[in-house]
């Protein structure tokens, strides 16, 4: 009798598509020259070798965190997937130099909204690499992450990941 009363209803899976937040060349995560990303310790995803210094929102959602050093941002999609865009490698050490945030924590964004801009020359001169991992940072809390096979992407146009949650 009480079995059905307390049964938690399983929700329907919701799939979202993540578009490229940066224009450039896709790099498989396993080939990123940083073991934290290459070994997927931060989560599943891909990376982009940027062709320009503009980052747009890859999903409709909410800005959860703009890192104080402006080298990374997390946007939460409508299905609760958290997309971490980490601009360059070892860029936290730049302490914000070369980065500009165009949004703040709590902002509601749509695909294509400008999130950040950065100076590629500064990053390539002072950091390890401009390669930018795009990670589902809460991979453990989503049902599935699928990479979409592409080699070159244009920000806001090409799909790079599907996330089912």
Curated annotation (Swiss-Prot):
Q: Name one GO cellular component term.
A: cytoplasm
Report whether Cytoplasm shows up as a keyword of the record. Answer: yes
InterPro entries reported for this sequence: Dup_hybrid_motif (IPR011055), PTS_EIIA_1_perm (IPR001127), PTS_EIIA_component (IPR050890)
Keywords assigned by UniProt, alphabetized: Cytoplasm, Kinase, Metal-binding, Phosphoprotein, Phosphotransferase system, Sugar transport, Transferase, Transport, Zinc
Report residues binding Zn(2+). 71, 86
Q: Is-annotated flag, keyword Kinase?
A: yes
Domain of life the protein comes from:
Bacteria
User: Which residues make up the annotated site Important for phospho-donor activity?
Assistant: 71
Q: Which residues carry this modification: Phosphohistidine?
A: 86
Q: Where in the cell is it found?
A: Cytoplasm
* A Pfam family that the UniProt record links to this protein: PTS_EIIA_1
Q: What is its main location?
A: cytoplasm
- A GO molecular-function descriptor: kinase activity
Q: How is the cofactor bound?
A: Binds 1 zinc ion per glycerol kinase EIIA-Glc dimer. The zinc ion is important for dimerization.
Q: Which GO terms describe its biological process?
A: phosphoenolpyruvate-dependent sugar phosphotransferase system
Gene3D superfamilies, per database record: Glucose Permease (Domain IIA)
Q: Which residues form the PTS EIIA type-1 domain?
A: 34-138
Entry's SUPFAM superfamilies? Answer: Duplicated hybrid motif
- Give the positions the UniProt entry annotates as the active site: 86 (tele-phosphohistidine intermediate)
Domain writeup: The EIIA domain is phosphorylated by phospho-HPr on a histidyl residue. Then, it transfers the phosphoryl group to the EIIB domain.
How does this protein assemble?
Heterodimer with glycerol kinase (glpk).
Q: What does this protein do?
A: The phosphoenolpyruvate-dependent sugar phosphotransferase system (sugar PTS), a major carbohydrate active transport system, catalyzes the phosphorylation of incoming sugar substrates concomitantly with their translocation across the cell membrane. The enzyme II complex composed of PtsG and Crr is involved in glucose transport.
Q: What is this protein called?
A: PTS system glucose-specific EIIA component
Q: Which organism is it from?
A: Oceanobacillus iheyensis (strain DSM 14371 / CIP 107618 / JCM 11309 / KCTC 3954 / HTE831)
Please name the taxonomic classification of the source.
Bacteria, Bacillati, Bacillota, Bacilli, Bacillales
